[in-house]
Amino acid sequence: KRLYAELREGDIIADLAAHEQHWPLIVAADVLCYFGALGDLLARVHQRLEPGGWFVFSVEKILPDHDGVVPGNGNWALQRQGRYVHAEHYVYDAVCTAGFRVLRIDRPVVRQEAGADVPGLLLVAERIRHDG
């Protein structure tokens, strides 16, 4: 269908570090759920975006258990299905710390699992700070 101008497969952090190209847009749908801490990935994405470039990505949202306890460290947790969930405050803070401005946050259902909705976050962030 020719949906992609370019599709890269491999370790995303290593791939971003190995290339010097800059892009106006990077999209990572259903990718960040395979990372706990997001700082290193966000820093590499920031380096590869043009000033004013956008990073659009989704994460699965962390939810308290039936006793109201947030799993993991309160910022992110590894679930038994092998994907990470993230707290909204953590994602927002990590994005801003990496030099982005959050333009939009939506809270969609990102998948169905075992017949249940999996809540998520969909963010649009703009690169605002220069590296260095």
Located regions from the model:
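A short glycine-rich, Lys/Arg-flanked "PGG" loop and its adjoining helix->strand segment in the class I
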Residues: G39-W54
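A conserved beta-strand element that flanks and buttresses the S-adenosyl-L-methionine
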Residues: V27
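A short His-aromatic
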Residues: C33-Y34
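Short conserved loop adjoining the S-adenosyl-L-methionine
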Residues: A14-E20
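Core SAM-dependent methyltransferase catalytic element
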Residues: V109-G132
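Conserved SAM-binding strand-loop segment of SAM-dependent methyltransferases
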Residues: R2-A14
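Short alpha-helix
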Residues: R83-G99, I105
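Short, glycine-/aromatic-enriched active-site segment of Class I SAM-dependent methyltransferases
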Residues: F57-Y84
